[in-house]
């Protein structure tokens, strides 16, 4: 459209053009990089296919047959090399041509190890049955392996169809993920536009020590760096979608991913039970999402190990804030799943405890709340000891990130099956299991649990018996915190970058002031609550983000959040 064309005008000051180039009485298949009428460099093709319908060696010679050199082209002295890297103020890019990508070690593998963050591939790639999917797989794999952006452009309508057909594929990938693609077999010219997040690429490379280890073993000739002029992109509007729920599988992947996540949880718990020769587990069932998912994992694990479900001891422990809705859902769920049901009220024990510690129980402060959580954990631990069982933890990744757990209360267990699953994903998983993995009676209860407000229920209900203490009113929406968590842990983004992305992802849901408020809360609590994560129980890693102090996240408990909070203030 007109606005986009106006905004992109400066970007077109750099062009990559395919053309044949004569050098030393031989013909090279080349990509020529230009900017503002100046030829910056010529990149010849390295691997020339000479099989089946291809016979490029009839015309061209390989870059391998020529040393890096300079030639005169259009009155300019221009470097010629397959190892050219083009430096911009923001990034660095390299080029390979068509068949180069199909080689066992593509030229791009060497280019990225020498600094390229984006690879451009100019191609004349003809169509065949199933070939398009194969090409997409190649590009995705090379982009993922190189931790790079990959821009692929192939010839289309207008090419000769004497023996083959060209569909005009345009594909943009980033670290293995497709960002944008053209319409195949279009009779019109197309412009495929997206943005590649080079900060994200750099974060991936810093984290991946295998990438760094390969830099010293880089194949091929040393790269030649070419400086390019600054291009103004400030007026560009972001076109790539920013997924507001990055932990949640989308579209056709939902069923497969949910099944895989559930299977990982089951496999983790099964191994622990077999290793300990334990045939009994104890789970506190509140009628909320987390304990529900933990119970479902236990049920499926026992089925897999051919152990009786009666060996799953589900304990509901009503307290001062328990509502009829969650209480009844807990009982109905345990009954429908066929586990052993125990009900132990914590009220009398807590009242006695308040007297022992001289606490006024009309004061609903942190002591009032945490005493209940620790009483429940004590019950679970002691019942497990009596029966020779394991206490299964229910806390999720979002709660661990925010420290929304009572230290040595629900924070503690003998194996935490939900430890790397964020709250937004817990909700989707329970809903998926309700629709795919249980009978109708359990399904009705599960769907009501999904619709129940998230709450620890440590404060008495309101006059109508409804939940008064709603977690998201206190610490903020979990969908925001999970978004912050993903961008912070997965890519190491600063608050400013996270705020920018969140403002786009949630522009129809939250205004910028709300996002800033809860981002500040996230940064403050994440640093403050590390001491709880430093002593977490074992639990299986499920996705790409984990807070295990033994694995993915080793952070001092007294790390300062000052820099992050200062940046939040300046947003």
Question: What are these language model-derived features?
Answer:
Residues 14, 24-27, 33, 40-41, ...:
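Active-site-adjacent helix-turn-beta-strand microarchitecture at beta-sheet edges
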Residues 3, 111, 142-143, 273, ...:
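Generic structural signal for hydrophobic
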Residues 1-12:
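Single conserved hydrophobic/aromatic residue that forms the stacking wall/gate
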Residues 18-21, 31, 36, 43-45, ...:
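Fold-independent oxyanion-binding glycine-rich loops
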Residues 24-114, 130-138, 166, 187-188, ...:
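Active-site catalytic loop in hydrolytic enzyme cores
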Residues 10-17, 96-192:
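CN hydrolase (nitrilase-like) catalytic-core segments centered on the catalytic cysteine
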Residues 36, 117-118, 279, 389:
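Conserved acidic residues
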Residues 89, 146-148, 157-160, 174, ...:
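ATP/NTP-dependent adenylation/nucleotidyl-transfer catalytic domains that generate, transfer
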């Amino acid at each position: 459209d007109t606005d986009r064309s106006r905004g992109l005008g400066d970007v077109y000051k750099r062009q990559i053009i395919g053309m044949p180039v004569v050098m030393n009485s031989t013909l090279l298949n080349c990509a020529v990089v230009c900017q503002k009428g100046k030829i910056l460099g010529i990149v010849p093709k390295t691997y020339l296919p000479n099989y089946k319908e291809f016979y490029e060696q009839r015309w061209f010679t390989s870059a391998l047959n020529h040393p890096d050199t300079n030639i005169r082209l259009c009155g300019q002295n221009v470097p010629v090399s397959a190892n050219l890297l083009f430096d911009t103020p923001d990034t660095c890019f390299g080029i390979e041509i068509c068949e180069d990508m199909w080689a066992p070690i593509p030229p791009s593998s060497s280019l990225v190890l020498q600094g390229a963050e984006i690879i451009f591939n100019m191609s004349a790639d003809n169509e065949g049955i199933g070939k398009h999917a194969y090409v997409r797989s190649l590009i995705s794999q090379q982009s993922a392996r190189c931790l790079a952006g990959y821009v692929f452009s192939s010839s289309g309508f207008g090419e000769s169809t004497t023996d083959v057909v060209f569909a005009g594929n345009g594909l943009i990938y980033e670290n293995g993920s497709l960002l944008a693609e053209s319409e195949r077999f279009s009779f019109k010219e197309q412009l495929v536009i997206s943005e590649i997040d080079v900060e994200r690429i750099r974060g991936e490379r810093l984290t991946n020590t295998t990438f760094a280890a390969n830099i010293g073993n880089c194949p091929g000739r040393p790269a030649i760096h070419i400086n390019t002029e600054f291009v103004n992109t400030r007026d560009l509007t972001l076109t790539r979608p920013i997924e507001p729920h990055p932990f949640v599988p989308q579209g056709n992947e939902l069923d497969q991913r949910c099944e895989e996540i559930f299977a990982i949880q089951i496999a983790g718990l099964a191994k622990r039970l077999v290793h300990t020769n334990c045939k009994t587990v104890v789970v506190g069932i509140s009628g909320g999402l987390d304990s529900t998912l933990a119970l479902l994992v236990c049920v499926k694990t026992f089925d897999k190990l051919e152990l009786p479900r009666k060996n799953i001891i589900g304990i509901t422990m009503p307290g001062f804030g328990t509502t009829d809705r969650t209480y009844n859902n807990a009982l109905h769920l345990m009954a429908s799943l066929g586990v052993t049901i125990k009900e132990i009220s914590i009220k009398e024990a807590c009242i006695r405890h308040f007297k022992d510690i001289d606490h006024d129980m009309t004061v609903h402060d942190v002591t009032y709340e945490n005493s209940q959580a620790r009483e429940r954990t004590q019950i679970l631990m002691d019942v497990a000891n009596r029966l020779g069982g394991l206490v299964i933890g229910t806390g999720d990744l979002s709660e661990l990130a925010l420290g929304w757990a009572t230290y040595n209360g629900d924070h503690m267990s003998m194996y935490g099956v939900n430890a790397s699953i964020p709250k937004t994903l817990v909700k989707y998983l329970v809903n998926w299991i309700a629709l795919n993995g249980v009978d109708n009676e359990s399904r009705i209860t599960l769907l009501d649990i999904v619709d129940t407000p998230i709450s620890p229920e440590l404060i008495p209900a309101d006059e109508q018996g409804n939940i008064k203490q709603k977690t998201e009113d206190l610490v903020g929406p979990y969908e925001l915190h999970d978004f912050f968590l993903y961008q912070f842990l997965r890519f190491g983004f600063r608050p400013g970058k996270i705020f920018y992305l969140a403002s786009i992802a949630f522009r129809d849901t939250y205004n910028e002031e709300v996002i800033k408020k809860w981002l500040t809360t996230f940064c403050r609590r994440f640093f403050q609550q590390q001491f709880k994560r430093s002593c977490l129980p074992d639990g299986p890693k499920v996705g790409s983000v984990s807070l295990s102090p033994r694995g993915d996240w080793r952070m001092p408990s007294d790390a300062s959040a000052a820099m992050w909070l200062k940046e939040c203030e300046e947003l």
